[in-house]
Amino acid sequence: MHRKLIFLFFIASFSFSQDVNWERVNSCPVGDPEFVKEVLEGMTVEEKVGQTIMADLDFISPSDLKRFPIGGILNGGNTSPNGNQKASTDEWKGLAEDFYIESTRRGGANIPILWGTDAVHGHSNVFGATIFPHNIGLGATANEKLLKDIGSAVAEEVLATGIYWTFAPTVTVPQDYRWGRRSEEHTSE
């Protein structure tokens, strides 16, 4: 399970990176194997298992992190802070900050929680966010600049809510046309 989560995060981190000149940002230190080893050796089994769990936003609160060392939060379709479908960006950002604070307050490894949001065609869980066509329609435009601009707009709106990980835009090529999430893919052309 842990390997699958790492693989998913790895693939998501490369979303939309092909043929794009990303500015180099030095905000994160290069991985230090000794540091990673030290952190892992200091973690309990409960903390290690917790890092593989991604709880749905509807079923977890910042106070739950005092007891459960959860590694991540997902807000998929129709989830929002405290069930408020019209929550402001400030409410989203406040909740993200609360989760961060509680995840680093527990003691032990103090690994900040990851929050991933489903923003396949915009940050649609946020009231007033810009909604874009699904990827299958965007792929049909064959307009790389448009796709980059949409990706930038979605990233800006997601960051405005204090969330740093989005499950979009995806770079997928349809292999099996029977797959039910075909609309989230671009094109095979």
What are these regions (language model features)?
Residues 4-13:
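Sec-dependent N-terminal signal peptides
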Residues 18-184, 188:
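N-terminal beta-rich core of secreted/periplasmic extracellular enzymes
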